[in-house]
């Protein structure tokens, strides 16, 4: 199964889905750019209306992210300190032993997480790795947690093996609009990413796919990223929106920060164009104050990464998140029994 990059000229609107993302909106990039141009309060109001139509606006889903294999990646993603192309403080490690993964998963569940996401810094997993990662999926899922993995590019048979092990979600981000992508990455094509998403869909695994903003892209290119995500068929069940965390030693280390209101606009536009997805605040949340996070929730974000670290970057401490939720009157989404996951 292959997914092609969507030409701007071919995108047309269709009726909005009402019960499931199987019939997604078809958006022109210019239409999404027009949403960005709305007065800030009008955009938030529209996003909040869409959000309340499909979700409890006071409920947030908690995911925890663990790096099960850090560093040593052959890709040259300009934002990533795990790349072997750049001199950073990240040290390469081998795949984490199963017992350590399970210990971390239990701790995440005890703190209220309902989904446990595991990342390995590979271009793609080798066959010798697949037996170990599928065992990890089975064991984590047996704890009653939803499971998500990001392992790089997948072949169809690898996606099927993960499905057979019970994987609920696979994360593979598009990162940016096609027009900006080549400025950030040269070792993996945009079509490579789309092909992996196609294999994941064909295997029957839920898709977690988002991108990174604040890498120096234009507003129109941010709109282009949202268009690519919203026009996947179906659009992702989970959309993580990352705000660049510049890391010393990477090509993007000195990138100027994105205007905070522009980040909130991106959350709102993602909610409007993908009304049934879980929009997740991801990397960069540590750099946001509580007022900015509250605006993001008002704009339609309904999921966060929960815990002190995201792969190699810091994240707000769990106690701070709980205090913020209490002050905002937010509740956390309960876990589903394992038997109900990835049906």
UniProtKB/Swiss-Prot annotation:
InterPro entries attached to this UniProt entry: Aldolase_TIM, BATS_dom, Biotin_synth/BioAB, Biotin_synthase, Elp3/MiaA/NifB-like_rSAM, rSAM
Positions bound to [2Fe-2S] cluster: 117, 148, 208, 280
Single biological process term from Gene Ontology: biotin biosynthetic process
Any note on cofactor binding?
Answer: Binds 1 [4Fe-4S] cluster. The cluster is coordinated with 3 cysteines and an exchangeable S-adenosyl-L-methionine. Binds 1 [2Fe-2S] cluster. The cluster is coordinated with 3 cysteines and 1 arginine.
Name the Gene Ontology molecular function terms of this record.
2 iron, 2 sulfur cluster binding; 4 iron, 4 sulfur cluster binding; biotin synthase activity; iron ion binding
What are the protein's UniProt keywords? 2Fe-2S, 4Fe-4S, Biotin biosynthesis, Iron, Iron-sulfur, Metal-binding, S-adenosyl-L-methionine, Transferase
- Residue ranges spanning the membrane: these are none
Instruction: Quote the SUPFAM superfamilies the UniProt record gives.
Output: Radical SAM enzymes
Question: What residue stretches are annotated with the Radical SAM core domain?
Answer: 58-285
Which protein family is it in?
Belongs to the radical SAM superfamily. Biotin synthase family.
| Known partners and oligomeric status | Homodimer.
PANTHER family reported in the protein's UniProt record: BIOTIN SYNTHASE, BIOTIN SYNTHASE, MITOCHONDRIAL
Q: According to its UniProt entry, what is the function of this protein?
A: Catalyzes the conversion of dethiobiotin (DTB) to biotin by the insertion of a sulfur atom into dethiobiotin via a radical-based mechanism.
Record protein name field: Biotin synthase 2
Which species is this UniProt entry from?
Answer: Polaromonas sp. (strain JS666 / ATCC BAA-500)
């Amino acid at each position: 199964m292959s997914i092609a990059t969507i030409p701007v000229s071919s995108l047309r609107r269709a009726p909005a889905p009402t019960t499931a993302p199987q019939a997604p909106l078809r958006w022109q990039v210019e239409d999404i750019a027009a949403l960005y141009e709305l007065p800030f309060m009008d955009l938030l109001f529209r996003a909040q209306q869409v959000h309340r139509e499909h979700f409890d606006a006071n409920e947030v889903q908690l995911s925890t992210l663990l790096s099960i294999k850090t560093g040593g990646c052959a890709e040259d993603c300009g934002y990533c300190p795990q790349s072997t192309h750049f001199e950073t403080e990240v040290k390469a490690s081998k795949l984490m032993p199963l017992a350590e993964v399970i210990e971390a998963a239990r701790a995440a569940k005890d703190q209220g997480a309902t989904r446990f996401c595991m990342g390995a810094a590979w271009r793609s997993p080798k066959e010798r790795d697949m037996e170990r990662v599928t065992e990890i999926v089975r064991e984590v899922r047996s704890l009653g947690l939803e499971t998500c993995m990001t392992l790089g590019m997948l072949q169809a048979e690898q996606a099927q093996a993960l499905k057979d092990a019970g994987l609920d979600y696979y994360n593979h981000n598009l990162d940016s609009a096609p027009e900006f992508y080549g400025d950030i990455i040269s070792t993996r094509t945009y079509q490579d990413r789309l092909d992996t998403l196609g294999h994941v869909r064909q295997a029957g695994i839920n898709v977690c796919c988002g991108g990174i903003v604040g890498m120096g892209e234009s507003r129109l290119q941010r709109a282009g990223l949202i268009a690519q995500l919203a026009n996947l068929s179906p659009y992702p069940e989970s959309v993580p929106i990352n705000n660049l965390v510049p890391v010393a030693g990477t090509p993007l280390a000195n990138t100027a920060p994105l205007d905070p209101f522009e980040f909130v606009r991106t959350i709102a536009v993602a909610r409007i164009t993908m009304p049934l997805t879980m929009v997740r605040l991801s990397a960069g949340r540590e750099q946001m104050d509580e007022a900015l996070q509250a605006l993001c929730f008002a704009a339609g974000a309904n999921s966060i990464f929960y815990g002190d670290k995201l792969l190699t970057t810091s994240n707000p401490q769990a106690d701070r998140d709980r205090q913020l939720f209490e002050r905002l009157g937010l509740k956390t989404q309960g876990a589903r029994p394992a038997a109900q996951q990835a049906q």
